[in-house]
């Protein structure tokens, strides 16, 4: 049997007042997701250990069977591996966002979802100013980049998406790398202030990328191969470096899809078709990750989150029509509209294709929590359980 796990990043939510106390999953029209839940078996899963912050890095690693307490080093390290960045044993890689700071507050953790081309121009100017510090900047997709610090010692940092609307001073880096990271941030603010890219963005009514925000730095992770753990060849389809970093560390195939953006305008159907085609080859398992639902949660947009769920559901429908195997559906964590950031609450999952069913009628948080026959499953046990046919 072959297996496909469809993951809507941040898709789970809390009751929303604007929706009459319902969640986006309860309001969205999603007949295909509901079919998986209705005809299959369901359960709840805690994807983030109490010892870790509720990030997509930790949650996705955990779902794939890797204990974050044992294998996780940092988000920056995973994204650096994905980008093929030279990574020595004494180096630390930090995730590095372009952000918008206004009146000393974190206005926008994604700098208006700056384009990758604009980001490259900003980084080229900043790298020139930082050339004497030995630091290397590697532009990624949109606002997501990597800062490589040779000889780094570590720093306590805060994810910028967790502090939107708050003063940044209490959340500046602390620890051994703090002074140098803060220096880089100050220099970036100076370099970006009158940069042509930002002048054009401001003129167009867009948020400028007026500073960098380094966070989640760590050493290169050492993880066992997915094929050795499970005896199956795995592949990952995504649009973000984080997921590709996990895949490369785990020895899984990386499948990139034209038109997959990691944002609301991603090519949902293109990803679904790529998943089906990949499973026609020698891959036994495909992990299909969609970021758009998470981005909508961070924006606090009920409309966009419902739209993202419904567009993902169309892709799920294509998969159900064209793939005859085991299909799993779940989020990695909630990204509640009201909070605009991740939480560590358990998430609902559904499995179709292993036989058996329960009393669940629709794919929603409440329905599955009340009626799912799997109960509460440990995230690192999911694939072992599914591959064993349970």
For the regions a protein language model found, what residue spans apply to each?
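Feature captures the catalytic ectodomains and active-site-proximal regions of enzymes
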Residues: 1-390
